[in-house]
Amino acid sequence: MSTLMNIREYNSISMIKGPLMAIEGVTDAAYNELIEVEMPDGSKRRGIVVDSQSGVAIVQVFEGTTGVSPTQSKVRFLGRGLEVKISEEMLGRIFTPLGEPLDNGPQVLSGEKRDINGSPLNPSVREYPEEFIQTGVSAIDGLTSLLRGQKLPIFSGSGLPANQLAAQIAKQATVRGEESNFAVVFAAIGIRYDEALFFRRFFEETGAINRVAMFVTLANDPPSLKILTPKTALTLAEYLAYEKDMHILAILIDMTNYCEALRELSASKEEVPGRGGYPGYMYTDLAVTYERAGKVRGKKGSITQMPILTMPNDDITHPIPDLTGYITEGQIVLDRSLFNKGIYPPINVLASLSRLMRDGIGEGKTRDDHKDLSNQLFAAYARAQDIRGLAAIIGEDSLSDVDRKYLLFAEQFERKFINQGINENRDIETTLDIGWEVISMLPESEISLIRTEYIKKYHPNYRVKK
């Protein structure tokens, strides 16, 4: 809707329910149009139109409807969408999804106002992701590589260290060779206060805050604000990527809270629920959010997205991870059994996948042996898991010598390759060298997926001889 539309004012509030209000006599309201509520004491609150039919507009108020008077409050329709002033100055700062500072710093003065709903990318101008992003986490870099412009979610479970992994990736991730032009936009959606405090302290103590822009809503914030959080964060990401030629990693945590907020608002509007009680348009809503990542022809910058979500009851078939998996290009799955062994990060590499990995690794991108080594590590670990199951039935004493070596490999693979400290930043060469160290525990005859030239070049037995 044009921003030249006249401001219309109404005092015909007919219904107040949770964060929603109904205003009668409105025939020209537009979906997502910004509204302003003037309270009886003169203070103002903002909201947006979420439905309009038969002359009745349904609006959701960001700050909630407590204190709104049906007779004394006025509602103004402003004829434009919600806009937030964004700027490079936001790096190193913490904001609400409305662009208000949460770090006791000044308001953003420079920059430009942008509609937080963004503009859809024309598929014909998208470029295919091909550049490797180094996260410093071996299980990701070595086996489920992240590429510039990719959407790669992390599926976590309640109590698993998704927050720590998200903070570590935000601190360490970089595009090799373009470190100075890389930044992180971090959207924390409906998290607890102690979690918000952890992220803030971690970024400040490690110095990572200087290249991170944070947008935070807490668990007790209205659902409408939680829904705005990723939209505002991605609006800043688009500005930095496509206007300032920066490479942006957008981390969205926790998308489960986002979907719960969608469900809460849908229930308030008395919409017919879909699968699991979530609104039928949740797939579309998630797609709109996730598809704001990518590379654009003619633009030097890019947006890479890592949505992080909590699987209710560790159920990967739950609607939220299920729909997320359809839209994104792979998944990184955190595993409770590894966590119980004391492995950090507890990434289940066999359940994890990066669909674009093959196009962003290898000679000239990471290292020439990367593809072969990752294939061999996957295959060996998968066989070791089968042998573990067999050993639980017949006992280790009944296993062959080769099978016992696979068990030793699996133990060392988990302890040395997957496991690392939260402040341990491994470059890709270190990751691959550790991979060779653990795969060398197997007889060379079992290393069948790696070309002989790479075995002669990188296998520890041959390196020592040199």
UniProtKB/Swiss-Prot annotation:
GO terms for molecular function: ATP binding; proton-transporting ATP synthase activity, rotational mechanism; proton-transporting ATPase activity, rotational mechanism. PROSITE patterns: ATPASE_ALPHA_BETA (PS00152). The keyword Disulfide bond does not apply. The keyword Cell membrane applies. SUPFAM superfamilies: C-terminal domain of alpha and beta subunits of F1 ATP synthase, P-loop containing nucleoside triphosphate hydrolases. GO terms for biological process: proton motive force-driven plasma membrane ATP synthesis. Keywords: ATP synthesis, Cell membrane, Hydrogen ion transport, Ion transport, Membrane, Transport. This is A-type ATP synthase subunit B. It comes from Sulfolobus acidocaldarius (strain ATCC 33909 / DSM 639 / JCM 8929 / NBRC 15157 / NCIMB 11770).
